[in-house]
């Protein structure tokens, strides 16, 4: 999910790890305050400590009710303020993904001048009119524009497919197809890759600006080619977002990796290369 449960770790109840020195089996408990969480350690090790052979995962009921909206913002900084307010509202939308103008254009959902917010709620238990109504009040407070009729259609009946139409549907299709486009693009001389970061809200504006300027400068230095660097915010915590940056440039002789290593990682300007 975009908020609240943003990691698969949140749904893992217990694990069994086979390591060179023996087997680690964690207990099945709904929660524990007895020291560091061993399941987080096991999952976060990503195979460096051993092989996970079993896991208990909390299943989620299939959603019966949905509500969705595609929102346009003329100014990216107002869109960021909006998703911050949503993240801190307690509404916990299941989808709250913000595309900057260039990312929106790459995804085929914008013209490169407006930021796009893909906003959605889902539940297996109850209709979501009240949640969406309050979220759209927040959107309106920050200058967002949306199609009211489309929002109503998304909530009109159980099993509505409105959330897969319009800008939300176009972005979803582009997101799913991107890995299939990336590898053939390399063969055509195009470098395209994405890296994830995390930062607190109070430092986001400067972080966003510095990452775009510094990474673009490093790639231009390595390739002597123009570069496009876009951003999407995919996951939100009350204290900060997880911005993903995508680089697109032409491939030439030279080492982009060495240039990026010389530039350093977002950690150096207060962020992280993982969320």
Predicted regions and their residues:
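FAD-binding subdomain of flavoenzyme oxidoreductases
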Residues: 1-97
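C-terminal substrate-recognition/cap domain of FAD-linked oxidoreductases
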Residues: 61, 67, 72, 80-263
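Long, contiguous binding/interaction regions
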Residues: 270
